[in-house]
Amino acid sequence: MTKYDPRKNAEGYNDPTPYAAEKHMMAQIRGKQARVAGGYFENIISASCDYYLSRGLAKIEKTPEPMKPLGAKNRKGQFLACYTKQAQPDYGGTLKGGRSIYFEAKHTDDERIEQRRLTQEQQDDLEAHHKLGAIAFVLVSMSLTDFYRVPWPVWRDMAEFYGRKYMTHAELSRYEVPATAGFIKFLHGIESEVLGKEATT
């Protein structure tokens, strides 16, 4: 017979304190909210990419996330898989005239965005594209209301520019790009500089 342990539940697992249980539940809720917000952010970016393509200004696509099957397909044709390490930026493509563009997209509901939101592999890849002459940046969403295009050199050298490895809402303001419902003009400024005057009309 198993000895009774008041710290464990009927299944034999450690019973969390009410505080720990609530903390875990809140973390799950925040995680779900972040996934929903991130998905909405991606949808807005996709709509923006479609807009630029329709005007013949750029072809920019989301980089597919590579998956590794963990087993054979079942009778329904389904299989389990996991995402493999992602090194490529979230989005990449070509601007009118041939110049390449690559960027990461990061959403936050906080009042600041941290440099560590990019993995080392993602940073290395953006750096490589930047060195080869591509336009590289991080597109930041704050609460899905304010959007910023942070040039890669600024993101990379954040500690040098700001004395720390994060940027506040106020510090991001100089990189803000216009947005309307369902569309982010993340090429604002780049349009006239690289694509010509017709891009700003």
Give short role names for the model-derived ranges.
Residues E127-D157:
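Nucleic-acid nuclease catalytic cores
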Residues T108-L132:
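Mg2+/Mn2+-dependent nuclease catalytic core
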Residues A72-Q78, E104-R112:
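Short, basic, glycine/proline-bearing loop/turn elements
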Residues P89-G93, G97-D110:
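Conserved catalytic cores of phosphodiester-cleaving nucleases, focusing on short active-site segments
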